[in-house]
């Protein structure tokens, strides 16, 4: 199994509606798990390059990626589509994000409700419809619920 993941650093319109001179920005990279400190540094640099008051997010893929499949698909796409060298990074990220290039099949639900009863019911629904035992379903509290 590979420790390769897709990372997305972005500043979205949705989060920055009232920020003067804001322009939506995003950067997608493919990184190994052991390079997470480098990704955090890139995140801080990306955020610092924004306008004052801009909110920036970092997303790390839940499922690791299969390097061999990514390499093969990238080579095929480079030959088939005659990709410009200026588009290599975005093409690599696009290939890496494809469902068939993941190593795992984990799910992530963003349940933005701060109500213990609703969270419990939601977890029971996930258990019921997926047949995944409750002991394998993890939950994490975030700033929004």
Question: Which positions does each model-derived feature cover?
Answer:
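Signature for HUH/AEP ssDNA processing cores
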Residues: 1-142
């Amino acid at each position: 199994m590979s420790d390769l993941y897709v990372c997305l650093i972005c500043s979205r319109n949705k989060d920055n509606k009232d920020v003067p001179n804001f322009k939506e920005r995003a950067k997608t990279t493919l990184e190994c798990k052991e390079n997470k400190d480098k990704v955090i540094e890139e995140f801080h640099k990306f955020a610092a390059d924004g306008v004052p008051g801009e909110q920036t997010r970092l997303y790390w893929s839940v499922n690791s990626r299969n390097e061999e499949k990514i390499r093969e698909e990238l080579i095929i796409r480079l030959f088939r589509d005659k990709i410009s060298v200026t588009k290599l990074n975005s093409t690599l990220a696009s290939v890496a994000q494809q469902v068939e290039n993941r190593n795992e099949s984990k799910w992530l639900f963003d349940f933005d409700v701060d109500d213990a009863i609703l969270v419990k019911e939601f977890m029971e629904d996930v258990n019921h419809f997926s047949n995944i035992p409750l002991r394998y379903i993890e939950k994490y509290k975030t700033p929004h619920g």
